[in-house]
């Protein structure tokens, strides 16, 4: 883990201190992480025409989503952002295998690109994962022995920064770390009161480590509010301890001057699976994240 982290520091330094000349493209880089609602369950077939094609001036490095202990987590390539980076997306680090789904990255990139920003997204997410050891279908605990999703995220960041020409135009690019977008917490809210109680401390620790990996200690952080569909029989909650996680998310963003809490998710409709938002929800989510990113850029200096 330390070897990966140190490698990130070296390669980021190369990018950040490159000579800035007028021929270099400048990209704002955002790390997208979390569990399945960051993966994305929107259907490409239901997208409006404005989002069905490639988003101009927007690139993505979508790290391969591999579970704990497997060697290929985080491999990937830079590619133009288009639908297909949602649930069941795969890559071998040479070719991307786009899926029939999309996540919040699509409308996020479209919203910022329309404002004239060159957007570069580094994405690593994995469904069902928690910050608390023993919860979910894998976790992000940096102190866990062996490789886990935190390590895969670091590998994704390192691999993304290993390429100094992300749009393959023959000129080195300047990559400016601009934010972290985090959509996660359902696994911790559904596991136990203990995992929910630990969420605030775990979230603080992980966000600061990802900030360090992106080489900016005050990097803006955007937290998406998790929600409960109550679509289990008799209206039972899918996440019995969600109130505690909500308090943690709210506390983190209120006490960090460079963080924002996106609560718009409260109004999104769920799909029939009871856990994931519908297509319209994922479009609105990306737009809300982009709005928060623009606000933090103005207010977090």
Regions found by a protein language model. Give the residues of each.
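Cell-envelope and extracellular/periplasmic
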Residues: 23-301
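Bacterial Sec-dependent N-terminal signal peptides
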Residues: 1-24
